[in-house]
Amino acid sequence: MANSPKKPSDGTGVSASDTPKYQHTVPETKPAFNLSPGKASELSHSLPSPSQIKSTAHVSSTHNDAAGNTDDSVLPKNVSPTTNLRVESNGDTNNMFSSPAGLALPKKDDKKKNKGTSKADSKDGKASNSSGQNAQQQSDPNKMQDVLFSAGIDVREEEALLNSSINASKSQVQTNNVKIPNHLPFLHPEQVSNYMRKVGKEQNFNLTPTKNPEILDMMSSACENYMRDILTNAIVISRHRRKAVKINSGRRSEVSAALRAIALIQKKEEERRVKKRIALGLEKEDYENKIDSEETLHRASNVTAGLRAGSKKQYGWLTSSVNKPTSLGAKSSGKVASDITARGESGLKFREAREEPGIVMRDLLFALENRRNSVQTIISKGYAKIRD
């Protein structure tokens, strides 16, 4: 062992004898060579050929056998270091050196291809991860709802509010799109044009209102204003006609109450005085006048009731049992009864005035009386119709 030759170094400046005997891997922290494109060409010329590698491997094996070393794991002698840094055992290095194929150095195109494939793989991995995360989020919406609920947000209320706002905006757009029709004229333009043409012929005036439709619109608006004014006046007159008279239903004045009390007292005193005079014999009771006054009041009340009912027929129970006069010149039993029989049916009758609701003919006629143009014939015809 003392005469064993000194083992060459592996290119790092450290002798092979100083290194451990069983070293399987080389540290990856420090690359052995600079594999830039410029250095790769120089390295390819300096590396030995496969035949040289075989011969050196054979010499190293025979040298180890002569020295008495039977261990196959000793590093080869006089061999340049390889670029394969992941060597697990010397047996693997021997197999590699004994392989007929030479070292394959990377090329420029290979680097670009490798970079492109690595980028594509990374993108595919990111896309697959993102798609997986999105699918997981879509498949589990309860977690999102729980987070929103914990934050104080009600998803259903927000959705309802969003739908209501969308519907309101749609309805507003629809209302804005609705076209309001133009105001229709008060009178039909064709009828107005025919009437104007007729009046023009009567006045020897050639008029063609169809050429100027603005004239027809002006005449229609003028007629509308005229009719509106007449109807407004008629409504005011009808309200004044149907206005009720205020009746003083409250307490009367103190003067009228005092006068009424005095009149009642005087009447009672007069009746008491008459009774005293009859009792003393100073005055006799007039039975005829008493009967006459009672009969007169009874007939007058019957006539008033008949006039109130509006019937001309008199029933038997409404008349008194006293004999009626046979002629107008006959002597009647009472002054009032004779006056009523003398008047007969030619006398005045009581009737309540009927107040028609709304606008009637006399209201319109009274409204037209204030008009001075072309209303004389209408007023005369209206009053004639009311009289009939």
UniProtKB/Swiss-Prot annotation:
TAF4 heterodimerizes with TAF12, forming ultimately an octamer consisting of a TAF6/TAF9 heterotetramer core flanked by TAF4/TAF12 dimers on either side, similar to the histone H2A/H2B/H3/H4 octamer. The 1.2 MDa TFIID complex is composed of TATA binding protein (TBP) and the 14 TBP-associated factors. One copy of each TAF1, TAF2, TAF3, TAF7, TAF8, TAF11, TAF13, two copies of each TAF4, TAF5, TAF6, TAF9, TAF10, TAF12, and three copies of TAF14. One of its GO terms (biological process) is positive regulation of transcription by RNA polymerase II. Transmembrane segments: none annotated. Residues 12-22, 43-64, 79-98 have a biased composition (Polar residues). It is found in: Nucleus. Residues 193-261 form the Histone-fold domain. One of its GO terms (cellular component) is transcription factor TFIID complex. Present with 1900 molecules/cell in log phase SD medium. Belongs to the TAF4 family. Residues 279-297 form a coiled coil. Keywords: Coiled coil, Nucleus, Phosphoprotein, Transcription, Transcription regulation. Residues 127-139 have a biased composition (Low complexity). Residues 106-126 have a biased composition (Basic and acidic residues). The modification Phosphoserine is found at S36, S49, S80. InterPro entries: TAF4 (IPR045144), TAF4_C (IPR007900). Functions as a component of the DNA-binding general transcription factor complex TFIID. Binding of TFIID to a promoter (with or without TATA element) is the initial step in pre-initiation complex (PIC) formation. TFIID plays a key role in the regulation of gene expression by RNA polymerase II through different activities such as transcription activator interaction, core promoter recognition and selectivity, TFIIA and TFIIB interaction, chromatin modification (histone acetylation by TAF1), facilitation of DNA opening and initiation of transcription. This is Transcription initiation factor TFIID subunit 4. One of its GO terms (molecular function) is DNA binding. Its main location: nucleus. Residues 1-143 are annotated as: Disordered. The keyword Aminoacyl-tRNA synthetase does not apply.
